[in-house]
């Protein structure tokens, strides 16, 4: 049977899921659980290549709306790049990436973003760009700066009122990614949402003292106070290691 590159069909979702689990070595059900916002878009965004009736390669091309002040830029986010471990070296990944780039050009996406090995993706025109800051915060430095823990409460991320308020606050950011599946993002394993003091905090981790800060938004500039908000952070010790906002 001739190899073909095309978009995933609805009845192939489970086959793709098993394929990605084998390629990445992740547990069963990992991708729908941890990327619930991407999975509904699979038939529109997942390019696959099939050989002998089986999926042997995949590249996801997911549309992103980047908002920078008054400007909106449509970009293509690349994810789930994988080739069958037994079929590597046959050019499947290159063929899929070239097809993805062609689709993005047809959709007039001026920008594409991915996370991965620079040398691997430089061949397709990708290059390291922008600035990334690593901030190491601790309780002592925040307290010395005059930050006091904000008065917040943990809320139910599945509550429609909570979702609406988080979306409203997120929309105040000058630079942001528009999120079409915000409610699904908040259902990922271990996600906790805290609100108060005119802002919100999203963390991952279910044990007290083991929370990983994912995102803090405060239109009034009180991010440090929100960062100190929970007893769990205080008991976690000195280091609070925030993850990049792009992780949500």
How would you describe each model-predicted region?
Residues 1-63, 70-77, 142-179, 210-212:
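Short amphipathic alpha-helix that is part of the acyltransferase structural core
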Residues 53, 83, 91:
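Conserved G/P- and acidic residue-centered "switch" motifs that form tight phosphate/ATP-binding loops
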Residues 78-88, 213-222:
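A short, internal acetyl-CoA/4′-phosphopantetheine-binding micro-motif in the GNAT/acyltransferase core
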Residues 106-110, 116-134:
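Conserved active-site alpha-helix within GNAT-family acetyltransferase domains
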Residues 128-223:
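Amide-forming acyltransferase catalytic core, primarily the GNAT-like/NAT-type
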Residues 227-248:
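C-terminal functional modules
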